[in-house]
Amino acid sequence: MDIMNEKVKKIIEFMDKNSIDAVLIAKNPNVYYISGASPLAGGYILITGESATLYVPELEYEMAKEESNIPVEKFKKMDEFYKALEGIKSLGIESSLPYGFIEELKKKANIKEFKKVDDVIRDMRIIKSEKEIKIIEKACEIADKAVMAAIEEITEGKKEREVAAKVEYLMKMNGAEKPAFDTIIASGYRSALPHGVASDKRIERGDLVVIDLGALYQHYNSDITRTIVVGSPNEKQKEIYEIVLEAQKKAVESAKPGITAKELDSIARNIIAEYGYGEYFNHSLGHGVGLEVHEWPRVSQYDETVLREGMVITIEPGIYIPKIGGVRIEDTILITKNGSKRLTKTERELI
């Protein structure tokens, strides 16, 4: 039985334990994870007690047949798809399924009961296979090259958006399907914006510049952040940079199987707080990375998830002082048998 069918088998076992007649998978990353297909116009996997089938609109049929590891059926109208659900009383669904679609399933397919299946899919996706890790490593390699290119491109007078355009082009030239998210090039006062997507602001001498980017490669993501100074850093910039670097390094060193996401977040957060900047670290320490750039676990002060070998997460502490500037240092890391391994490897010292 191949790996895709092993995933279906685990879902069927979950169905048996929870008295679910069938499971409907509609979220694009989950459709790809289970079937190996990624229909642009969307698709639905219907898993019953004996089989799994991918249903796609007619225009996606030929491509889906080439990609899918499970049988594929096509439909012209949604009513044709609803017929495949006839006789099903209890249906497992993802929490992301739109309310309107659920109402249609009640009306058109006469579904009486809906049960959430997010946990079983999340528990499978949260541990990466060797194949997945190799793909993510390549995505990280592309991101590393892009960060170095950004550092070279950043000069006084250049627009943030110009730098972003260059590095996004480079990522595609190096094999990325596209950026994992809108590239952040945030300079000067904008570096204090954690999600300061590249703008028309011109970079100035003395600016802190936060570079946050990622590459999507063969459906998997990477994520990296580095912060530089244009010209020579002042004492305040050096101070907050060294604090963030200390917190980031300590968290990476502490990441290992058995520690909780909450404990890991606290390690970095406490270091920043001890230096008096706790109020300026206003987001979680990190997040899982895989088919989605933000997925489980949430490496936050509220997440009790126990880290396990094979998880891929980010470690990204920051200090953001409004109207002055900010610093963030982020790596994508792999939880290994005895610790962790940085998958993004660009130098972390202040440039």
From Swiss-Prot:
Binds 2 cobalt ions per subunit. GO terms for molecular function: metal ion binding; metallopeptidase activity; proline dipeptidase activity. One of its GO terms (biological process) is proteolysis. Its cofactor is Co(2+). SUPFAM superfamilies: Creatinase/aminopeptidase, Creatinase/prolidase N-terminal domain. One of its GO terms (cellular component) is cytoplasm. Its main location: cytoplasm. Co(2+) 2 binds at residues 212, 223, 330. Gene3D superfamilies: Creatinase/methionine aminopeptidase superfamily (3.90.230.10), Creatinase/prolidase N-terminal domain (3.40.350.10). The keyword Cell wall biogenesis/degradation does not apply. Homodimer. This is Xaa-Pro dipeptidase. It comes from Pyrococcus horikoshii (strain ATCC 700860 / DSM 12428 / JCM 9974 / NBRC 100139 / OT-3).
